[in-house]
Design a protein with these regions (language model features):
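Gly/Ser/Thr-rich loops at beta-strand to alpha-helix junctions
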Residues: 2-3, 47-56, 139-145, 360-362
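Active-site glycine-rich loop that binds ribose-phosphate moieties when present
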Residues: 114-128
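Short glycine-rich or small-residue beta-strand-to-loop segments that form or flank ligand, phosphate
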Residues: 15-16, 40-50, 135, 352-359
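Gly-rich Lys/Arg/Thr-decorated short loops/hinges at beta-loop-alpha junctions or inter-strand turns
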Residues: 2-18, 37, 82-110
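Catalytic or ion-translocation cores adjacent to nucleophile or general acid/base/metal-coordination motifs
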Residues: 24, 65-82, 147-188
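A conserved active-site cap/scaffold subdomain adjacent to cofactor or substrate pockets
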Residues: 164-270
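C-terminal non-catalytic interaction/assembly regions of soluble proteins
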Residues: 267-418
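Flexible, glycine/charged-enriched surface loops at secondary-structure junctions
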Residues: 69-73, 180-195, 239-258, 315-331, ...
Length: 418
């Protein structure tokens, strides 16, 4: 669940009380539920969004349609959604300060769209221990989804920090799917085979905390030490303090070793006690934006795109339009590396002009969208790329990370019979 996804789901639920969860999860479960029951395969997913009960109910109805009554239980984990508690929390002095800016949440109180604490593995473990074959959560850590079945299966103690850290790192490695099995891998990327049929990663865990990352045979991609290393540094932060609700993992202790074709053994991991806080993901409305694009062709593609940007800005100034920010990128010249790219070649085949504006007032953003198309006939020559029509105004949903005392969050576990 991406940060912005929760706000989208809150809006969906506001329009339809039965909505607010990952709708594509239910048809996927329809495909695999019979096999899960037959082979005793457990499924853990944070597909519940802001309506975990609704998602679980839809899965239950699907299971009944498949004739699986009485053959499985669905665990429901809630307690992460604190949107309705914001005023109470602020009133009791819990400021929910922005972790990046240190601003108190009260500065954006009237624009909040969603607020969810990241739950860890323990409530999922409780659901598994209660016999759940399917466990559905709302906001939970990606690592907790992987750690929970290890705790359930091996009976790890809640203070066995090294093993909890190992399970956490296993979750970190596989949380982005094929990103660790060849997808977007920089190391010798041209030689990675058959990404069209890329194999998703598997973590083979053992009770001592050592695990192996692999993938299914006869699938594409590659699992090797470089592919695992690249994933390890993804969204890592301080390598000595990878903080989760369950523990703090020390990435500097990780050891990797090839364990055969498409197999990497991960071991030596150390951890320590978790903090007394949970992270909260808050989304809020932050104004509006619009982005317009045009493509200019050789010769002088970059110069034409720059000239078009100058013309556009002059016209916007003449209209006295006020924006919080206006940003220009030249895709194909320097959009990725910015000033580090140096001066673009004078012989580029084509350059896309990409201009975006943002602001708190929708009116000037709307007016901006009407100024891109005129450049087609009143700007530099050899222009294309306008078939998509006028740019559209979009609401900006911003992210507000905060911390909350663990004592303020009480996960709730319910087990539903099919």
């Amino acid at each position: 669940l991406a940060e912005v996804t929760m706000s989208i789901m809150q809006k969906q639920k506001a329009r339809d009380r039965a909505a607010g969860y990952a709708r594509d999860f239910v048809p996927l479960m329809k495909q695999i539920l019979p096999a899960c029951v037959e082979r005793d395969i457990k499924v853990i997913a944070n597909a519940g969004g802001v309506n975990v009960e609704g998602c679980a109910g839809a899965v239950r109805e699907t299971a009944r349609d498949l004739g699986l009554q009485g053959k499985l239980k669905i665990g429901i984990v809630t307690g992460d959604d604190i949107l309705d508690r914001i005023d109470d929390l602020l009133g009791r002095g819990i400021k929910l300060r922005n972790m990046d800016t240190d601003e108190p949440l009260v500065t954006v109180r009237n624009r909040i769209q969603s607020a969810n604490a990241y739950l860890g593995a323990q409530p999922i473990v409780e659901a598994l221990d209660g016999g759940s074959q399917i466990v559905i959560t709302g906001r939970a850590t990606d690592t907790g989804l992987t750690l929970a079945p290890m705790i359930h299966e091996f009976g790890w103690a809640a203070d066995d920090w090294d093993k909890l850290a190992a399970g956490t790192i296993a979750g970190h490695i596989i949380e982005c799917g094929a990103q660790c099995s060849g997808g977007i891998c920089q190391y010798e990327w041209k030689t990675i085979p058959d990404l069209a049929n890329v194999g998703f990663p598997i973590a083979e865990a053992s009770s001592d905390g050592i695990f192996v990352i692999t993938k299914h045979e006869a699938t594409g991609g590659r699992v090797n030490v470089p592919s695992i290393k690249e994933q390890l540094v993804y969204e890592m932060g301080d390598p000595r303090q990878y903080i989760t609700p369950d523990c703090i993992a020390d990435f500097t202790t990780i050891q990797l070793a090839d364990d055969g074709a498409d197999r990497v053994r991960v071991f030596g991991i150390k951890g320590r006690a978790a903090t007394d806080s949970l992270k909260v993901s808050i989304s809020y409305s932050a104004g509006y934006k619009a982005v317009g694009t045009l493509v200019y062709a050789w010769p002088d593609a970059y110069e034409k795109a720059k000239a078009a940007d100058g013309i556009l800005r002059a016209r916007l100034d003449r209209l006295s339009l006020q924006f919080d920010q206006i940003m220009t990128e030249y895709v194909g010249a320097n959009a990725t590396h910015g000033p580090l790219a140096g001066e673009p070649s004078s012989d580029l085949a084509e350059v896309q002009l990409r201009v975006g504006v943002r602001g708190s007032d929708r009116t000037p953003i709307e007016r901006f969208t009407k100024e891109i198309a005129p450049l087609i006939l009143t700007g530099p020559p050899a222009v294309t790329g306008f078939a998509g029509g006028r740019p559209k105004v979009e609401e900006i949903v911003a992210y507000w990370p905060a911390l909350i005392p663990k004592s303020e969050i009480t996960p709730h576990v319910e087990i539903m019979e099919v």
